[in-house]
Amino acid sequence: MIDRNGYRANVGIILLNSKSQVFWGKRARQNSWQFPQGGIKSGETPTQAMYRELAEETGLQPVHVEILGRTREWLRYDVPACWTRRDWRKNYRGQKQIWFLLRMLGRDCDVSLKTCAHPEFDAWRWNQYWVELESVVEFKRQVYRLALTELSRLLDHETCLGNDQAYREPLEPVKELEEKSSDARQG
């Protein structure tokens, strides 16, 4: 669904574990990291789209998470023309997103990146709430900052303590999904 201003309705998901660390997925066959996100289909509410995207990209079901909150307004970013599907270029400017903050109630083993034919991610990791965003594709970074900042109001003080040092801790090197799986079996 693209609105009259050229923005596709979308949801973004910031998923926390019990240590208030954030889920990051590595884009399949790319060297960039991002949060789960995806388009809102016709007839879907943002909440319904969030649960569908969560299941498609992480394998998690509603029973595995609780909603802590969402952004008050749509957050927007423009997508460079070179990243846009050719048939969309006339009317498409970018994405407008409602961001959800979720707490994971399930376990790490509930996460599965292979729930659909073309997975979005080929690796995942937990990281601190406030990290550098260099590993995020450049045109999404400002929206990530806005979403993290707005939703941080829902977190306890200790989790947000690093706000003045936000985005200074880099994402650690990739740990591939297969390595995680074999480590879990050996341990």
Swiss-Prot record:
Q: Can you give the residue ranges of the Nudix hydrolase domain?
A: 6-149
Q: Which cofactor does it need?
A: a divalent metal cation
Q: What is its EC number?
A: 3.6.1.-
What does the protein in this record do? Accelerates the degradation of transcripts by removing pyrophosphate from the 5'-end of triphosphorylated RNA, leading to a more labile monophosphorylated state that can stimulate subsequent ribonuclease cleavage.
Q: Does the keyword Hydrolase apply?
A: yes
Task: Tell me the NCBIfam families matching this sequence.
Answer: PRK00714.1-2, PRK00714.1-4, PRK00714.1-5
Q: Which GO terms describe its molecular function?
A: pyrophosphatase activity
Could you list this entry's UniProt keywords, alphabetically sorted. Hydrolase
Pfam families linked to this entry: NUDIX (PF00293)
**InterPro entries, A to Z:** Nudix_hydrolase, NUDIX_hydrolase-like_dom_sf, NUDIX_hydrolase_CS, NUDIX_hydrolase_dom, RppH
Where do we find the motif Nudix box here? Answer: 38-59
Instruction: Name the family.
Output: Belongs to the Nudix hydrolase family. RppH subfamily.
Protein name per the record: RNA pyrophosphohydrolase
Has keyword Nuclease?
no
